[in-house]
Each structure stands twice: as structure tokens, then as C-alpha cells.
Swiss-Prot record:
Protein name: Shikimate dehydrogenase (NADP(+))
Xref: InterPro entries: Aminoacid_DH-like_N_sf, NAD(P)-bd_dom_sf, SDH_C, Shikimate_DH, Shikimate_DH-bd_N, Shikimate_DH_fam, Shikm_DH/Glu-tRNA_Rdtase
Pfam family for this entry, one: Shikimate_DH
UniProt keywords, alphabetically: Amino-acid biosynthesis, Aromatic amino acid biosynthesis, NADP, Oxidoreductase
Active-site residues, as the UniProt record annotates them: K65 (proton acceptor)
Pathway(s) where this gene product acts: Metabolic intermediate biosynthesis; chorismate biosynthesis; chorismate from D-erythrose 4-phosphate and phosphoenolpyruvate: step 4/7
Top class in the EC scheme: oxidoreductase
GO function terms (MF aspect): NADP binding; shikimate 3-dehydrogenase (NADP+) activity
Length: 267
């Protein structure tokens, strides 16, 4: 039996056990998958105890992705560039860190929603860890431009500069975006979690695809997008399922059917 878990704080809300158990049933693997509340100031002790129990791997969510990045002794290219880890695989003495967030987002946008990113103008709201985790996979799709916008403009400037070698990036503060329209808007801020709407011009949502990394309810960002005539609106549930599938394949080598799981969760 494979032994897996997800670490976070808080963690009760996590859908990961449900998703991973559905994948296991599909593919014929026997797994255990727990939710583990790690102390904010002692992530390492929690994961080390889990590893000592014979763990095969685990997922990491807020606020421990940077801690997991530091804890891993081997990193994939995605994890190195993202600077954070959301999936770890244990192989003997190897603690291999991966970041599946960005690839999960791309798969949801392209496979589930049917949106191509090539030659598109993409606006990303926020310049924190969530944005850093998705930028490299987005730029690999060869969009025309990726605009990073953040309340603290210096963070957006730094992120745009750091990723400029992978594609065409630029930055603006949230209330000074100099674009009248874009093709895709991705909300990677915590505004929806806090019940707030990002401070950006209403007109920019007109006829755009609007995607919120948050999931589970009609977020304030999604309501804002609907009011302002977005062409298509989605939450991040598909991304959650797709990134979980990549983690499952990373651990087991088996590729699960995400559409069935996503359909079950949408019911």
C-alpha cells in the first residue's frame, strides 16, 4: 500500500484525499491518504515523522510550499524555477520536490475549458507564490505577453524581470494597468479568499476569459467578471484536480482520468 498525505495549516477544507482516493480506485492502486495539520513553525518535524512511518510521498499546501522547497534534497526543473514545492516523492534517501500547480492550470485551461494561450495577452493579478508557481508553464505556451499586476508594484516588477528570459513579461500596479482589454485574466491574489475584489478597471474584463485560482464557490472575482461581461468564467477546481493527477502520476507512474473526478466534484 502506498502511504500519502497532504500537509497544510489550515487543512480541514482540503479536497485532496477525496481526489487522490478516486484516482487510486480508477487505477487499481491501494493507498492511504491523510490530512495532516502541521504547526506553522515546525513543518519539518511533521513531515519527517511522516517519512519515518514509511511514507511514499505527500502534497503541500498553504503556508508550507517554501518550507517544502527547502526541505527537498532534489528538485525538478518546475520546482527550481517556481521556487516552491507542492509535491514530494520519497525514493530511498531522495526527497524529490516537484511543483504541479502551473502544469495543472495549463491542463485545465487547454484540455477542460478549451482555451489556447499561444499569442494571447494574459493578465495575472498578484505577484506572490501562487503567481510564481504558474508563470513558467504559462510562458512555455508562448503567449504574446504576460502582464503581472500587483498592489505592491515592486513585487510585480521583480517577478516580471526574473521570468523575462522565458517570455515577454511586463508589470503594472493594480490600479494603473495601461491595457483596455486582454484575452485572459487570472486571479492569483488572496482577494477572493478575503471576500474582496481586485482594484482594477471594470472594462478590462469585457470579452476576456476570467479564471480564479480559488474554488468551491462563486468568488467575488467571478461575480465581478460576470458583471463586467467576461466571455468565460471559471474557478480553480479543475486546476486542483489536474495538479493532483500530475502528483499521482509522479508518485505511481499511473495517469488517472481527471474528467470523471472533476465531474464528480462539480455535482
Amino acid at each position: 500500500m502506498y502511504k500519502f498525505a497532504v500537509f497544510g495549516n489550515p487543512i480541514n477544507h482540503s479536497l485532496s484525499p477525496n481526489i487522490q482516493n478516486q484516482f487510486a480506485k480508477q487505477t487499481g492502486f491501494e493507498i492511504s491518504y491523510d490530512k495532516i495539520l502541521a504547526p506553522v513553525d515546525d513543518f519539518v518535524s511533521s513531515v519527517q515523522a511522516f517519512i519515518n512511518q514509511g511514507a511514499n510521498g505527500f502534497n503541500i499546501t498553504v503556508p508550507f510550499k517554501l518550507d517544502a522547497f527547502k526541505f527537498a534534497n532534489e528538485l525538478t526543473l518546475n520546482a527550481k524555477i517556481a521556487g516552491s514545492v507542492n509535491t514530494i516523492k520519497i525514493e530511498a534517501d531522495k526527497i524529490i520536490g516537484e511543483n504541479t500547480d502551473g502544469i495543472g492550470l495549463i491542463k485545465d485551461l487547454t484540455h477542460n475549458i478549451g482555451i489556447k494561450l499561444k499569442n494571447k495577452v494574459i493578465l495575472i493579478l498578484g505577484a506572490g507564490g501562487a503567481t510564481q508557481g504558474i508563470l513558467f508553464p504559462i510562458l512555455k505556451q508562448k503567449p504574446n505577453q504576460v502582464i503581472i499586476s500587483n498592489r505592491t508594484h515592486s513585487k510585480a516588477i521583480r517577478l516580471a524581470k526574473n521570468f523575462s528570459k522565458f517570455g515577454n513579461t511586463c508589470s503594472f500596479s493594480l490600479n494603473k494597468i495601461k491595457y483596455k482589454s486582454v484575452d485572459i485574466i487570472i486571479n492569483a491574489t488572496s482577494a477572493s479568499f478575503d471576500g474582496r475584489i481586485p482594484n482594477i478597471a471594470f472594462s478590462i474584463a469585457n470579452n476576456a476569459v476570467c479564471y480564479d485560482l480559488m474554488y468551491g464557490y462563486q468568488t467575488p472575482f467571478m461575480s465581478w467578471a460576470k458583471t463586467n461581461h467576461a466571455k468565460m468564467i471559471s474557478d480553480g477546481l479543475g486546476m486542483l484536480v489536474e495538479q493532483a493527477a500530475i502528483a499521482f502520476e509522479f508518485w505511481t507512474g499511473a495517469k488517472p482520468d481527471t474528467k470523471k473526478v472533476l465531474s464528480n466534484l462539480r455535482r
